[in-house]
Amino acid sequence: MNVLFVCEDNSALSIMAESILNSVAPGRFGAYSAGCYPNEWLNAHALEFLAQHRMPLANSRAKSLELFRRPGAPRMDFIITLCDVAADAQFAGWPGDPFIAHWHVETDDATGDADDVLRDNFWTLMRRIKIFASLPHGKLNRRLLERRALTLRPSYL
């Protein structure tokens, strides 16, 4: 099963989510990330944090959402948006009719400490992705699986 994590710029949140899923469920999922408006660079603090936690970083580069709409792109089973900009993106008519879920991850912090926000986001994503990966994919019908995936939204965690 293929999962595409989408955020605004594909520089931190979606890169972390891709890396986490590849780490917690190797071989079970194809994890990908993209941005609605991808940066030219990745967040150096996010990459450093992932490396410190021994998370895989293969193919880590900012990618456009449009890359995954093209013919020959991997067929997505799930598209998970991580910010409001990504949630507003148009996924109607996406090839393969993937299930779309929005897991808003808060990126603003009143203290202004970017490292604290990054750390909190990493552990929030880790919890949600571990639960997502533990769902019996392939054994539940699509509607039941979709309902369970939706419970991973912030109001439930």
Identify the residue ranges that each predicted region occupies.
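Short glycine-rich anion-binding loops that position phosphate/pyrophosphate groups of nucleotides
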Residues: 9-11, 84-87, 107
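Alpha-helix C-terminal capping/helix-to-coil transition sites in glycosyltransferase folds
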Residues: 74-75
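Phosphate-binding/catalytic loops
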Residues: 89-157
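Acidic beta-strand-to-loop metal/phosphate-binding motif
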Residues: 78-83
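Conserved active-site segments centered on acidic
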Residues: 1-69
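Short, basic, helix/turn surface patches
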Residues: 58-62, 85-92
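Short, surface-exposed, charged/polar-biased interaction segments
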Residues: 24, 32, 42, 52, ...
